[in-house]
């Protein structure tokens, strides 16, 4: 009982799907599933790019703050 390793398991699953949805509906379901997967991947990619851009912005802000603090310290020491 190693799961769905037998070809007969897959044949039965496909037969049940055809009986439930009909042969005409299966291409529409596959198209919808493919479209959903494509949209999901695009959303994940967009989120990753947004996170990278945010990280770059935060890093730049931290660098500017550090430079500003360093220049303030130097000006106080010179006074």
UniProtKB/Swiss-Prot annotation:
Q: Which UniProt keywords apply?
A: Cell inner membrane, Cell membrane, Membrane, Protein transport, Translocation, Transmembrane, Transmembrane helix, Transport
* InterPro entries in the cross-refs: TatA/B/E, TatA/E
Enumerate the residue ranges of region (Disordered): 54-79
An individual GO BP term:
protein transport by the Tat complex
Q: Where are the transmembrane segments?
A: 1-21
Tell me one GO molecular function of this protein. protein transmembrane transporter activity
Give the membrane topology: Single-pass membrane protein
Give the Gene3D superfamilies listed for this entry. 1.20.5.3310
Principal place of residence:
membrane
Assigned GO CC terms: TAT protein transport complex
Instruction: Name the cystine pairs.
Output: none
Give the subcellular location.
Cell inner membrane
Where is composition skewed (Basic and acidic residues) in this entry?
66-79
Quote the subunit structure annotation.
The Tat system comprises two distinct complexes: a TatABC complex, containing multiple copies of TatA, TatB and TatC subunits, and a separate TatA complex, containing only TatA subunits. Substrates initially bind to the TatABC complex, which probably triggers association of the separate TatA complex to form the active translocon.
- NCBIfam families linked: tatAE
Protein family (similarity comment)? Belongs to the TatA/E family.
Q: Which HAMAP family match?
A: TatA_E
Q: Function, please?
A: Part of the twin-arginine translocation (Tat) system that transports large folded proteins containing a characteristic twin-arginine motif in their signal peptide across membranes. TatA could form the protein-conducting channel of the Tat system.
> Which named protein is this?
Sec-independent protein translocase protein TatA
Q: What is the organism of origin for this protein?
A: Helicobacter pylori (strain J99 / ATCC 700824) (Campylobacter pylori J99)
Q: Which gene encodes it?
A: tatA
């Amino acid at each position: 009982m190693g799961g769905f390793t037998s070809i007969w398991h897959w044949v039965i699953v496909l037969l049940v799907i055809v009986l439930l949805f009909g042969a005409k509906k299966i291409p529409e379901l596959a198209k919808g599933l493919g479209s959903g997967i494509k949209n999901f991947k695009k959303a994940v990619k967009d989120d990753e790019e947004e996170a990278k851009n945010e990280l770059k912005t935060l890093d730049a802000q931290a660098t500017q703050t550090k430079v500003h603090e360093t220049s303030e310290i130097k000006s106080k020491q010179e006074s």
